[in-house]
C-alpha cells in the first residue's frame, strides 16, 4: 500500500511464504540426512542383521567395539591416515597454487593437469594406481630396470606399504581440489604487500612466509579441517588397492572399511556396524570441532 492508500500491485506475502520455498530442500535434508542418522543411532542399540530385525541390546555393540582388536587396528590406521595425509594436503596444494599463479608460458596446461584427478572417478584412479604399484607394474618395472631392487617392492602385498600407497593416492587426488581453495585465497592477497616487501629487499621465500602464509592461514585451517574429515572417511583407495580383505590379514583396514566389512559382509551385522559408524562420527566430530576452534581462534 502506498502513502496515498493506493495498491502497489505487488503480490501480498504471508508469513509462511519463505518456508514454502525452503520446504523442498528441508524435506530432502530430513529424508536423506537426518532420518538415516537417527535410524543408525537406533540400530546401534540392537542386534539387527541384514536379513532380519533385531532386539534391543543396550550398549553391547559399543562394548564389543571397544574390546575388539580389529576396531582398534582400524582406528589406528584411520588416525595414522589423518596424521600423514592432512599435513600433505595443507602444504602441497598451497605450494602448487603459488607456482601456478606465476606468469610462466604454458602454466594453464599445468593448472588443468593438476585438477584432472579431481574430476576422475575414484575407482578409475584406484585402478590406475593399482596397475602402477603392483608387483609387475610400472614402478617395480622401472626399479628393476635401474637395478634399484632385486625383488619387487610389496606396495600392495604388505599392510604397511599398502596403507602408505593408499595415502599417496589420496594426496595425489586431493592436490588439485585444495589447490583451487588456495588460488581463491591468494587472489585476495593485496599485490601492494608483495610490492612493498620487494622494495624493502625481501626475496620470494621471505615474502612467502611473511606475507602469503599469514594471509592464507584461515584457508589453511579450513583445508586442514576438510582434509581431516576426508581422511577419516577413506574407503575406496583401501578397497581398490587391497581388495575386499583390506590387505594381508586386514592390516590396512580403516574404520569405514571395517563398517562395510561387518555390515555388508557375510555376517551382515547391521547393529554392530551402526555402532562403529557412530564411533567414527564422534571421532570425526572431535576433529571438526577442533578445526572450528582453531579457525575461530585465528580470526580472534
Q: What is each of the regions a protein language model found here?
A:
Residues 1-13:
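Short, Lys/Arg-rich, polar N-terminal cytosolic tail immediately upstream
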Residues 14-300:
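A structural signal for multi-pass alpha-helical bundles of membrane permease subunits
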Amino acid at each position: 500500500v502506498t502513502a496515498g492508500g493506493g495498491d502497489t500491485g505487488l503480490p501480498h506475502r504471508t508469513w509462511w511464504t519463505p518456508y514454502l520455498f525452503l520446504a523442498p530442500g528441508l524435506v530432502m535434508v530430513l529424508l536423506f540426512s537426518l532420518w538415516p542418522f537417527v535410524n543408525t543411532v537406533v540400530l546401534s542399540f540392537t542386534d539387527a542383521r541384514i536379513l532380519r530385525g533385531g532386539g534391543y541390546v543396550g550398549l553391547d555393540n559399543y562394548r564389543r567395539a571397544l574390546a575388539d582388536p580389529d576396531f582398534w587396528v582400524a582406528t589406528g590406521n584411520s588416525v595414522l591416515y589423518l596424521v600423514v595425509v592432512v599435513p600433505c594436503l595443507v602444504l602441497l596444494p598451497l605450494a602448487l597454487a603459488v607456482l601456478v599463479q606465476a606468469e610462466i608460458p604454458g602454466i594453464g596446461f599445468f593448472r588443468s593437469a593438476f585438477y584432472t584427478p579431481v574430476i576422475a572417478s575414484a575407482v578409475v584412479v584406484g585402478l590406475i594406481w593399482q596397475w602402477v604399484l603392483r608387483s609387475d607394474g610400472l614402478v617395480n618395472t622401472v626399479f628393476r630396470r635401474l637395478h634399484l631392487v632385486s625383488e619387487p617392492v610389496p606396495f600392495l602385498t604388505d599392510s604397511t606399504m599398502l596403507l602408505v600407497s593408499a595415502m599417496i593416492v589420496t594426496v595425489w587426488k586431493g592436490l588439485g581440489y585444495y589447490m583451487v581453495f588456495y588460488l581463491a585465497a591468494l587472489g585476495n592477497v593485496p599485490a601492494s604487500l608483495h610490492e612493498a616487501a620487494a622494495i624493502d629487499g625481501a626475496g620470494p621465500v621471505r615474502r612467502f612466509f611473511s606475507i602469503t602464509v599469514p594471509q592464507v592461514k584461515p584457508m589453511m585451517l579450513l583445508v586442514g579441517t576438510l582434509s581431516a574429515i576426508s581422511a577419516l572417511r577413506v574407503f575406496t583407495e583401501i578397497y581398490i588397492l587391497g581388495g575386499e580383505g583390506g590387505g594381508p590379514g586386514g592390516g590396512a583396514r580403516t574404520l569405514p572399511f571395517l563398517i562395510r566389512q561387518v555390515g555388508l559382509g557375510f555376517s551382515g551385522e547391521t547393529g554392530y556396524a551402526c555402532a562403529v559408524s557412530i564411533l567414527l562420527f564422534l571421532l570425526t566430530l572431535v576433529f571438526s570441532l577442533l578445526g572450528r576452534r582453531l579457525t575461530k581462534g585465528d580470526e580472534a
